[in-house]
């Protein structure tokens, strides 16, 4: 290659002019939403909106009561409580997403200050990557990241890993037009920003920088907001609409019913009094608004937030860094996972899968001469090196296939560096596609300085150069062996050697190897092995009713073989289940729509093939998760319901994703699905618990409205039940661990209402029973002077004298303890187990204890604020014991169902 002095490069003035004209070499980051706007976005939740409306109504009524009716300031407790509930819920959601994004930014830091060798004003200098401009002459070599899109001026054995852009791990680059690859995604004489030099070196002229590069264009495309509504959001929208409609209907019924009652009851009275009617109508409207407020589950947003936040933190421990809170639950609704191959299904590390050296017993290098020749041949006839800074997990620098051979030596406790230093290379013949082999003549360190020719390349070509073979393996036997390797999508290399005598010529620059007495040493098969945990993880997803599709830049044969190894591809699959990128692009939208569910593999996929696949699956009603680690994956990651980037993926891919798989393993995706499904069930359990409370409370307000009595539960007591206690309940149910049994179920129907048939029955029946029990207890307390629950059976009912603070304490505690025991039933819902199955439920039990202690403290110390008075110990025992019947009936029902 020409020396760098042949190029003058740009002058300082030309650099500034180019930067002014074409911009800087930095990808413009997506415009960050201001913190205040991100916080306000949390108020777009439909349940939050209902709460805010209810809070405003409640505040107006409180103002009227305080200023118009001269009531105490305690009337403001209810609106304050509602607004506190809103702020707690939105604040927590904002905090946890902010924390996750901070962790993500640390993970996704991009270094634009990496030094790059350029030629400017005739000198070779190093400048930061961000200072590269269009027109710069850049020098690139093995291990370098390409800083910008450029055209090659010179190249020597240049191989580039373009997998981040095209999915192709090894692309040969050349300036010789005759050697251009007609099927290559990008011209063979172009190198692209974000790709990496795997072997060789070259000089190139920069054509585009920053946003104008191919990486920049894909990054910009990934910023288009293709967000879709998540399944959980859809369900909460439906729930909020249901609650709104029911509360409005009840409010209208109360107003109409009470107005009718007024006229019916007042028909015999003397005349019609507008002042009395206005006062009555105002109190009726206040009762109607109270129903609206009571009907809204104040604790639900908090429950959802806590459940999502808890799952976010726990999922991080299992290799899932969740950036967007909704993605936790959406993973549970996933019906299709579109995954790439390299690095997710496989280890992204070329490895010697099988060695076939006849002279090696058990294919282990020994102390014999053949072993020494094999080891030296691999070490010296190679362009790759190893980074041994981590001796346990060395990494390859250079060609991954050649690096796999050095790793094999390393695993056999042979140091390739010692072998290289012990020999002297005399002549080299680089690898060329037309020859399909490379060769080197060395003064051997293992044969006391004798000249030895080593040849490595395509086994069938290397074997044809040989006069004999170790072990007398025939050509037919070799071909049969190679066919078996090819069926397994493995790359193969053959090895040969010859000890040269005197001045015997072994290599000719034009004709290649000219030696006539080569001995074939053997063959190795190299592959990127499947991760050990992937087959089981894929089987788990398939058992869970989740379809898995492979989208890769590899050949159809390689993709199908990987599919076979992980249990995704079998003999029963036909051509309809596999397609190449160009074929997929040629299909019409109607043809893709018809075929997309049957597809298992898209091979030779291009950047937008995966995005089109995702969009079509979504049109068919599928909930789609997509994995990707390359810049080319960003549009699909952004489009999918859940985008899953890999921890060692590009910054562009991670920026477009919702979850980053920090350990790069497909099995982590299976765990995310399990968490998502369990999370949805936990939210269902809380809704079951919360709505039972609300149904009972609504019935109480309704009964009071038509019977002309006040609610037996004060505003502050209802705040404890609906806000504080429900928040603790949300924490308790959110802390329930994920259940592996959910992976045996099929994905839930995203259109199925979050309150299923069983929940509806339990809410209405349980809420109705609680109401009747409470109504009966209130009736007894109103019509008798209850001083101790031990005397309840001997009480005489009278005409009614109102409720004392002691009786209010009994009623309040009675209602709370009914909900307390019902939480056990809610926890057992969907488990098929007893409510006493407490495995991994320490947090649940602790929070229940906090609720019980809190109730005791409020009744004992709450005084006038809560309209309560301390209860004797025997009354506590009676209340706790009597209300526990809720749990025992639930246990009997579960036992009967079993």
Sequence positions of predicted segments:
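Conserved cytosolic headpiece of P-type ATPases
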Residues: 1-747, 752-755, 768, 812, ...
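Short hydrophobic alpha-helical module
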Residues: 133, 381, 771-783, 817, ...
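Helix-coil boundary and interhelical linker segments in multi-pass alpha-helical membrane proteins
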Residues: 705-714, 780-807
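Generic alpha-helical transmembrane segments
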Residues: 725, 806-824
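Alpha-helical transmembrane segments of multi-pass integral membrane proteins
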Residues: 67-69, 762-777
């Amino acid at each position: 290659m020409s020396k760098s002095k042949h190029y003058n490069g740009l002058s300082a003035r030309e650099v500034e002019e180019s930067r002014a004209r074409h911009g800087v070499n930095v990808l413009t980051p997506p415009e960050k939403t201001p913190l205040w706007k991100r916080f306000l976005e949390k108020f777009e939740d439909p349940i939050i909106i209902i709460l805010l409306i209810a809070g405003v109504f409640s505040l107006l009524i409180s103002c009227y009561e305080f200023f118009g009716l001269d009531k105490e300031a305690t009337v403001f407790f209810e609106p304050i409580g509602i607004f506190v509930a809103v702020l707690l819920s939105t604040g927590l959601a904002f905090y946890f997403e902010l924390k996750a994004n901070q962790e993500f930014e640390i993970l996704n830091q991009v270094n634009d200050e990496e030094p790059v060798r350029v030629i400017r004003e005739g000198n070779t200098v190093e400048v930061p990557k961000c200072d590269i401009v269009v027109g710069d002459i850049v020098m690139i070599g093995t291990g370098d990241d390409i800083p910008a899109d450029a055209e090659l001026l010179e190249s020597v054995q240049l191989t580039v890993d373009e997998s981040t852009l095209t999915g192709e791990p090894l692309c040969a680059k050349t300036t010789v037009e005759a050697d251009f690859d007609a099927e290559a995604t990008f011209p063979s004489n172009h190198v692209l920003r974000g790709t990496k030099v795997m072997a060789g070196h070259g000089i190139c002229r920069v054509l585009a920088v920053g946003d104008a590069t191919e990486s920049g264009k894909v990054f910009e495309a990934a910023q288009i907001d293709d967000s879709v509504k998540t399944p959980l959001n859809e369900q909460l929208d439906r729930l909020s609409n249901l609650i709104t409609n029911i509360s409005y209907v009840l409010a209208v019924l109360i107003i109409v019913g009470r107005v009718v009652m007024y006229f019916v009851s007042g028909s015999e009275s003397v005349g019609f009094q507008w002042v009395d009617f206005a006062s009555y109508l105002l109190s009726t409207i206040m009762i109607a608004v109270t129903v609206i407020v009571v009907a809204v589950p104040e604790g639900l947003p908090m429950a959802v937030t806590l459940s999502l936040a808890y799952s976010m933190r726990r999922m991080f421990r299992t290799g899932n860094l969740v950036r967007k809170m909704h993605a936790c639950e959406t993973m549970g609704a996933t019906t299709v996972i579109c995954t790439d191959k390299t690095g997710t299904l496989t280890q992204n590390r070329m490895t010697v899968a099988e060695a076939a050296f006849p002279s090696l017993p058990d294919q282990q290098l020994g102390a014999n001469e053949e072993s020494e020749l094999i080891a030296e041949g691999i070490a010296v006839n190679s362009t790759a090196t190893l980074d041994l800074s981590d001796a346990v997990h060395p990494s390859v620098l250079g060609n991954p296939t050649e690096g796999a051979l050095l790793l094999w030596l390393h695993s056999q406790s042979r140091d390739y560096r010692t072998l290289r230093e012990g020999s002297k290379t005399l002549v080299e013949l680089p690898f060329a596609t037309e020859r399909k082999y490379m060769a080197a003549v060395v003064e051997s360190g293992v044969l006391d300085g004798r000249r030895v020719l080593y040849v490595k390349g395509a086994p069938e070509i290397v074997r044809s150069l040989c006069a004999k073979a170790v072990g007398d393996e025939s050509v037919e036997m070799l071909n049969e062996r190679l066919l078996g390797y090819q069926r397994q999508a493995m790359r193969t290399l053959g090895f040969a050697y010859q000890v040269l005598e005197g001045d015997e010529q072994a290599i000719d620059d034009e004709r290649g190897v000219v030696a006539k007495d080569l001995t074939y040493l053997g063959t190795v098969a190299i592959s990127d092995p499947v991760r050990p945990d992937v087959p089981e993880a894929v089987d788990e997803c398939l058992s869970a009713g989740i379809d898995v599709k492979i989208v890769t830049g590899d050949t159809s044969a390689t993709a199908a073989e990987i599919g076979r190894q992980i249990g995704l591809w079998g003999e029963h699959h036909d051509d309809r289940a596999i397609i190449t990128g160009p074929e997929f692009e040629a299909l019409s939208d109607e043809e893709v729509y018809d075929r997309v569910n049957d597809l298992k593999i898209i091979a030779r996929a291009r950047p937008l093939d995966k995005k089109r696949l995702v969009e079509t699956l979504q049109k068919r009603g599928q909930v789609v998760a997509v994995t990707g680690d390359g810049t080319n994956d960003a549009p699909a990651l952004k489009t999918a319901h859940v985008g899953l980037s890999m921890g060692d993926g590009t910054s562009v891919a991670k920026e477009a994703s919702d979850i980053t798989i920090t350990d790069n393993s497909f099995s982590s995706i299976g765990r995310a699905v399990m968490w998502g499904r369990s999370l949805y069930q936990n939210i269902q359990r809380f809704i079951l618990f919360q709505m039972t409370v609300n149904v009972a409370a609504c019935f109480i307000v309704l009964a009071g409205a038509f019977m002309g009595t006040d609610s037996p539960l004060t505003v502050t007591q209802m705040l404890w039940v609906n806000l504080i206690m429900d928040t603790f309940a949300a924490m308790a149910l959110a802390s329930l661990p994920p259940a592996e049994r959910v992976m045996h179920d099929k994905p839930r129907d995203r259109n199925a209402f979050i309150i299923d048939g069983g929940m509806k029955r339990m809410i209405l029946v349980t809420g109705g029973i609680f109401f009747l029990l409470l109504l009966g207890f209130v009736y007894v307390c109103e019509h008798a002077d209850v001083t101790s629950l031990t005397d309840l059976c001997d009480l005489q009912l009278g005409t009614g004298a109102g409720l004392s603070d002691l009786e209010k304490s009994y009623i309040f505690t009675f209602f709370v303890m009914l909900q307390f025991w019902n939480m056990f039933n809610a926890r057992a819902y969907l488990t098929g187990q007893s409510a006493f199955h407490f495995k991994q439920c320490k947090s649940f039990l602790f929070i229940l204890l906090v609720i019980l202690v809190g109730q005791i403290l409020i009744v004992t110390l709450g005084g006038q604020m809560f309209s309560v008075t301390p209860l004797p110990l025997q009354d506590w025992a009676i209340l706790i014991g009597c209300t526990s019947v809720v749990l025992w009936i639930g246990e009997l029902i579960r036992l009967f169902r079993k």
